[in-house]
Curated annotation (Swiss-Prot):
The lineage of its organism: Bacteria, Bacillati, Bacillota, Bacilli, Bacillales. It is found in: Cell membrane. Belongs to the UPF0324 family. The keyword Coiled coil does not apply. This is UPF0324 membrane protein lmo2147. Keywords: Cell membrane, Membrane, Transmembrane, Transmembrane helix. It comes from the Bacteria. Gene3D superfamilies: 1.20.1530.20. One of its GO terms (cellular component) is plasma membrane.
Amino acid sequence: MSQILFKTKTFWYGIALTFCIATLSYFLAKLPFLMILGQLVTAILIGIIIRALFPVPDKWFTGIQFSNKVILRAGIILLGFRLNLVDIYHAGWRVFLIAALCLSFGITIVYFLAKLFGVDKKLAILVACGTGICGAAAVVAISPQVKADNNQTAVAATIIALLGTIFTVIYTLIYPILPLGPDGYGIFAGATLHEIAHVIAAADPGGSSAVDMAVIVKLTRVALLVPVCFVVAKMVNAGTKNRFSWAELPVPWFIFGFLATSAINSFGIIPTSVTDFLVICAYFLIAMSMGGLGLNVHLPSFGKMGGKPFAAALIGSVFLSVFGLALVLLFHLAG
């Protein structure tokens, strides 16, 4: 009984740590030199700094992972109360095409570079899918399809978490000089950044319309996780005795929750004052997940894993950013 209680306590300690990070980031983001980054990016950076400077107990990571995954999805579902489904219709087919093209390009270029650098095939697939689809969630989903071991999965997830954080900060800083309006910037961020959390954090300086568009585009990429898993599993298992299982395919159910809250908001069922409060709660929950994301970045581990997969993902992410920006401009969606 005491062991169960102890585990329960450490679980809540992890959640409490992300709660404190979210609270601290809320106030720090009001400072002039951090205002440009915003609360969400600040939360990521606080998490990274805490992990680098202080020994975070391993047992706390159960709660931290809960914040990083479950609380993030709860925040995204609540964020739907700010979106009107009419906005999705107005986004048009070009937006969804950009999402699909960037996903395909991201996976292809990173995998090609990883193999060029001599990275193990399984690790190359994990890093490529993490870059092209939805970050660490894609890494974890693809891992059983390619029969990757725990070390390969952890390495790929760490690479994506760190790269996504770096690019989130860069996007936030260069937004004022990009030839993009809020909607165009949201499409660009949603089509090219790694994690859903990264997308929301990077789009936040562009305002509500940028975040809404970014979430729509990013969730389009997330929705494609299932067919990508299917294709990867069939390709990897071709010519082997391994049997494909539909039960192993991951389904991102939280997307339906996001669409449901968006529909409720579109019909005006809930008063604006209530939805405004729910959106504030959504941002706080997402900030908690940002803190968890930062806490998962273990900088010393990069000295052990080698730089090849990181270099492949870094160069591939740069190409993906340029490709995504070019598509937004080509399809005349910069505004």
